[in-house]
Amino acid sequence: WESGLSTPELPLIVEMADFFDTSIDVLLGYILKDNRIDATARRLRHCQRVKDLNGLEEAEKALKKYPNSFIIVYRSAMLYQALGLYKRDNAKLRRALELLEKARPLLHQNTNPRISEQTLYVAMAEISQDLEDDERALELFRQHNTDGLYSDCIGMILAKDAKRAQEALPYLSESLLIHEAALVRTVMGYLNLFLNSRDYAQAQALLAWALPIFTAMPRPECTSFMDKINSVFYLFQAHVLLKTGQPEDARTSAEEAHRLAVRFDAAPSYAADTIRFAMPGEDSTVNDDLGETAAQATQNALKQMDDPQTTALWQEMCDAR
C-alpha cells in the first residue's frame, strides 16, 4: 500500500484504523472540511454576526445532517432571525419561529448556561413582534417577565396603541426604574475599575458623561434618593479632578456634592416616584448600600478614595456650612 502497488479493501482499512488507534481520514491522509456539530454551530454563529446570506445554505445542510441537534437547530434559528430582520424578509422570520419551536424539545441537550427555555420564548416573542403579531408577542413577554425583565418590551408594544397607552404606563415605569438602577451600578463598576487602575482620564470622561444623566433623573421639585447617590458621584468627580490637576473644577464638584448631601439628609426619601417619568403613586422604594445617610455615604466614599487632598477639600466644604 505504501509503495502504491495495491489498495486494501474498505473493511481492512477500518480494521487498520482501529488497530493503530487512529481515524480513517488520518490513515488515508485525507482532510475533510470540519463538519462536526460544534464547528458547524460556530460557523453558523459567525454567519449570524456578519449577516452572511450564504450561511442559510449551510444551515439547511446542517439541519438535514443533524436534525435533532439542539445547538444546530438553535443557531440556525438565530441566523434566520438575524437575516430576516436585516433583509426585512418575513419568510425568514417565520422559518426562525419554526426552528425555535423545534428547538424546545431538544433543550435538554444544551450545555450553554446563557441559553435557557426563556431564551427561546423571548426570541419567539421578538420575532412575533417583528411579524406584527403583537398579541402573541405580548403573551410571551408577559409569561416570562420575571422581575420586570421584559417590561420595556411590553410597555413599548402597548404604548403603540392609543387605546392601551395607560395600560403601558406601569410597565414603562417599572422598566425605567430597573434600567436606571442598572446604569448607576454599571457606572459605579466602571468608576471603581478606572480608579483602581489609576486611569483618571477615563474616570473623568465617565463622570462627565454619566452625571448629566443622573442629575436629570430626579424630579426637581422634591428630594430624591438620587440626590444622595449623586452627592457621592460628585465627590468622586472632585477626587478625579484633583488627581488630574484641576483644583478649581474639583472645588465646584465638591460644593455640589455637599449641597446634594445636605438637601437629602434634610428630607430623605427613597420613594420610586421621585424619579422623573415614574408612574405617580408608584409605591416601591429603592435601597442602597452607600450608607444610612448622605453624610455617611460621602464618608464611606472618602475612605475608599484614601486621599488626604480630597478629604481636606471635603472637610473644608463641611466647615463652611
Enumerate the language-model features and the residues they cover.
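Recognition helix of helix-turn-helix/homeodomain-like DNA-binding domains
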Residues: 1-7, 29-30
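Hydrophobic micro-packing sites on short alpha-helices
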Residues: 8-28
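Generic helix N-cap/helix-start motif at coil->alpha-helix transitions
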Residues: 34-40, 68-73, 113-121, 144-153, ...
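"A position-specific structural signal for the A-helix of alpha-solenoid helical repeats
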Residues: 42, 75, 79-82, 123, ...
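Helix-turn-helix repeat elements of alpha-solenoid scaffolds
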Residues: 45-59, 87-105, 125-136, 158-170, ...
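Flexible helix-coil transition and linker loops at the boundaries of alpha-helical arrays
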Residues: 60-71, 102-117, 137-142, 175-181, ...
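Structural signature of alpha-solenoid helical repeat junctions
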Residues: 68, 75, 92-95, 112-116, ...
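Short coil/turn linking the two alpha-helices of tandem helical-hairpin repeats
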Residues: 77, 82-88, 111, 132, ...
